[in-house]
Amino acid sequence: CNGSGFDRFSAATGVGYEDLATWEGFYDAAGKFYDWSGKPFCALDYPIRAVELCAMEHGSGDFYTENGWYDTGNAVFKESWMQFARSLAQGHVVVSDLYSNTQVMTGDVLSGLGSSAAILYYNDTVTYRDGTQEPMDLRVLPMPKTAGVDALMTQAGVGLCAYKTTAQKAEAAALFVRWLTENERNLDFVAQTGYMPVRNGAFDDIETYDKFPEPVESYQQLYAALKTMRENDTPVSEPRFEGYYGKVTALYDGLRQLQQELPARAAAGEDVDALAEETWALLCSIQ
């Protein structure tokens, strides 16, 4: 989040970072920011994942189909989608162009919701479209959750693998993995990249770690947020269906088209729920 911009928004509206802890508070804050500034509050890199986790937290059960998409008859999943879609339809949030950090750094949005590794790509300065600049004062928070229930978090990452080869090379590959994931070395590695540690011991050492890169305070906030999520949230793996991510790409491309027109139609008086239903129809059309 652009901390400099958020400070002005907070002073004008009373919205604080604590209000972003829940999805309800997040979307409410997004509406208030839009009313105050006329701009979207947040660009989401992976909105379908946010919808999934929110639905699961509400007790949706399994909402995947045999062909690797979504059960559009699952009412809880749909309502989770509609919560996001109503905000999108009014211009309160947007699907990011690809990665939200670019839109945050140009002041097009105040915040971004995406991977922890995005911290690598933030500048120290926000440069607005009119050429004015101010310090980013980057603030990092845990992902919102549903109020009053056990929180979930997404689990995604990069795996290490080795080709089937000679016994000697296989032993060397295993030795490398053990070397790379030793507690201190693992923490040194991930602290430069924004990734989560893979060892319990590395997580335990985060609070006293003193070798974060600049901006140190932002990295400290990131790892404090990751530590909080690890301690309090249940990880959920991402879908692995064949062809799934091609469908997600089609969904996001369609949403980017719709978000160019829906806010103006909402402002002109069209029913927000009806506009949100257009995004649901898009999701339902993907097979």
How should these model regions be labeled?
Residues 4-18, 90:
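Aromatic-glycine-rich donor-binding/catalytic loop that engages nucleotide-sugar donors
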Residues 7, 23-70:
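Extracytoplasmic/periplasmic solute-binding protein
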Residues 16-19, 61-79, 130-132, 145-151, ...:
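Short, solvent-exposed loop/beta-turn-alpha elements that line the ligand-binding surface or hinge
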Residues 28-32, 98-112, 253, 257-260:
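Short helices/loops that flank or line small-molecule/ion binding pockets
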Residues 110-115, 120-122:
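Paired acidic/hydrophobic, glycine-rich loop segments that form the ligand-binding mouth/hinge
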Residues 214, 220, 224-287:
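Conserved C-terminal helix/tail region of periplasmic/extracytoplasmic solute-binding proteins
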